Amino acid sequence: DLSLSMKDDLDTIRNLGTKLAEEMRKLTSNFRLGFGSFVDKDISPFSYTAPRYQTNPCIGYKLFPNCVPSFGFRHLLPLTDRVDSFNEEVRKQRVSRNRDAPEGCFDAVLQAAVCKEKIGWRKDALHLLVFTTDDVPHIALDGKLGGLVQPHDGQCHLNEANEYTASNQMDYPSLALLGEKLAENNINLIFAVTKNHYMLYKNFTALIPGTTVEILDGDSKNIIQLIINAYNSIRSKVELSVWDQPEDLNLFFTATCQDGVSYPGQRKCEGLKIGDTASFEVSVEARSCPSRHTEHVFALQPVGCRDSLEVGVTYNCTCGCSVGLEPNSARCSGTGTYVCGLCECSPGYLGTRCECQDGENHSVYQNLCRDTEGKPLCSGRGDCSCNQCSCFESEFGKIYGPFCECDNFSCARNKGVLCSGHGECHCGECKCHAGYIGDNCNCSTDISTCRGRDGQICSERGHCLCGQCQCTEPGAFGEMCEKCPTCPDACSTKRDCVECPLLHSGKPDNQTCHSLCRDEVITWVDTIVKDDQEAVLCFYKTAKDCVMMFTYVELPSGKSNLTVLREPECGNTPNAMTILLAVVGSILLVGLALLAIWKLLVTIHDRREFAKFQSERSRARYEMASNPLYRKPISTHTVDFTFNKFNKSYNGTVD
C-alpha cells in the first residue's frame, strides 16, 4: 500500500529484502521474492481528478506537498533470488494520495494471483502473497460510485509496463472471485494489517480459504517476524477445499488430526509437525435424484497445494424391485398394479389395496382417518377418502403422515431460518446435518474455532460448545480461555526464562539461560502493548520491589514468542526527610487555613451584627420628655396660713 498514510512504513521496509531473505533461508533453501504496489482507481470519487492534481495529488497538502500521481496497481519486480534488486526497487518508490479512506488493494491481490507468468510463480513452490495496508479495502459494487458497472472478469490485465490497465474499466473483485483465483493458483494470502482493522480482515479469512491475518505495527517494524509467523502457521496447517460441488449433494467431513482424535464437521488440522499425519473422511449424500444418466464431478484440494482429488458421482435412483410388476394383482383388489410392495391403482380406484371407487361414501370408515378418538379428521389438514387421509397442499411446505400430522415447516427457527439452515424439518423436529446439533441445529460441533495457534482446545482451560470456548478453569477468560491471571500456568513457568538474561537478577550464566529458553523466542522492548488480543500479559515483582512485565504468544511450532521489557518498572524510593517536612508542612498549612477560616467567619459575623445595629438605630424615633428623677436647684412653694400675732391674718409666699 503506497497511499500517503503508509509513508513511514515505506521508510521502514527499504532494507526489508536483506533481513527477510536471511530469516527465510533458515526455513527454506530456495527462496524468491518480488514486489508490487497499489493505491486506488484513478477516477472520482476514489482519487483527486482535478487537472491541478494530475501530476501531484499532494499539492496544497502542507504535511507532505509532493507525491507521485495516483495509480491502481503496478507490478514492479518479478520473483527473484536477487535481494539487492528488491532493495533497490523499494528504495525507488514514493507514496501517492487517494481521496477516500478505503484502498484498491483487492484489485492488486487479484492481478498478483492470476498474472502467473509476469509475477513468476513457480509451479511446485509454496506461494505466499503478503498484503500490507493500514486501512479497509474496496470490494465489489463499490465501483458503481465511480460509474463502473462491469463486474471484474478475473483475468490478467497487466500491460507491457506491468501496470493494471483495467483499473478504471471494471468494478473491484468480490471476495468469492478473490478466493477462487487464490485457490486456483495455490496462493496463500497473508493480511498484514494494523490493529484497528484486525477484526475486519479476520472475518475475511473465514470467507477466503488459505488466508491468515497478522497485526502490523504502525511503522511496519515487525513485518519480518509477521511473515515468519504466518509461514509457520501455513506450513503447520492442512485444510480441504471443495471445487464445483453440485447443489444436490451434501458433503460431510470428519478430520482425524495428529492426536488421533476424530473431529466431525471439521475439514482442517492445525499444529502439524514434520512426520505428523492427518486424514479426512468425506461422506457424500444425494439430496435429490437428477435425470437418468446424470454424472457430476467435484474436486477436493488441500488449500495452497496443487494436488487434488477428483470425485465422479453417479446416481442410482431406480429400485431393483420395480422389475417384477404384477398388473391387475389380486393384492390390489384386481384394480391396480403391485410394484415394490405397493399398489398403483387404476384410474377411478383408491385405497392402499385399491379397494375403493372414487366418489363412494365411506363415512362409516372415517374413524380410520383419526389418530385417536375425538381428534379432527386427518388432523384438520386433509380430506378422508377411502379410509385414508389425502393431505392438503400448503404454500409453506409439505404436509404428510397417515393422519396429516406431520409437515416440513413447523420446526424451530434461528434468526428466521428453519433449522438454522443446517438441517431438515421432519414432523416438527429438526434433523441436523452432520456437524450440527441442537433443537434448531444452530450449534456447530466444529472445534477448529476453539483451537488456538498452539493446537490446544480452549487453552486446556475449558470446553468447546457450539464453536465457542466455555471457560471452566476459575479465573480464565478470553476468546480461547488464554488469559488467566490466577492460573499456575505459563506466566510462572516462563518467569525463569525472562529473569535469566537480566543482569541484576543474580540468575545463572548464559548456558543455563539457553537451556531455560530453548523453546522461547525473546524480543526486548521499551514498552509493553497491554491490550494485544493475541498475547497473554504476565507481570511479577522483583527482589527490588519493581514490576516486571512480559507477554507471550504460543506459536504453531510449539515455541513461544516472548515480548519482555528491557528494564523493570520501579518507583522512586521515598526520602525520610522529605516525608517529614511534607507532613509538618501539611499540618502547619492545615492549621493556618483553619485559623484563617475562623477569622473570616468571625469578621463576617461581627459585620453583620454591626450592620444590624446601624439599621435599627436609623429606624428609631424618640419623643421629648423629662427625667422624673431630676430636680431643679430652684423650687417654689406656695403656703396658705393665718398669722395672728398682732391679731392679723396674712396670706403670702415665702422664699
Swiss-Prot record:
Q: Which residues are glycosylated?
A: N203, N316, N408, N442, N510, N561
What cystine linkages occur within this chain? C58-C67, C115-C156, C257-C269, C289-C317, C321-C340, C332-C343, C345-C354, C356-C386, C369-C384, C378-C389, C391-C404, C406-C427, C411-C425, C419-C430, C432-C441, C443-C466, C450-C464, C458-C469, C471-C481, C484-C487, C491-C538, C497-C517, C500-C513, C546-C570
Keyword Calcium part of the UniProt annotation: yes
PROSITE patterns associated with the record: EGF_1 (PS00022), EGF_2 (PS01186), I_EGF_1 (PS00243), I_EGF_2 (PS52047)
Domain spans labelled I-EGF: 321-355, 356-405, 406-442, 443-482
Show which residues sit on the Cytoplasmic side of the membrane: 599-655
**Regions crossing the membrane:** 576-598
Q: Does the keyword Membrane apply?
A: yes
Task: State the name under which the record lists this protein.
Answer: Integrin beta-5
Lineage at the top is:
Eukaryota, Metazoa, Chordata, Craniata, Vertebrata
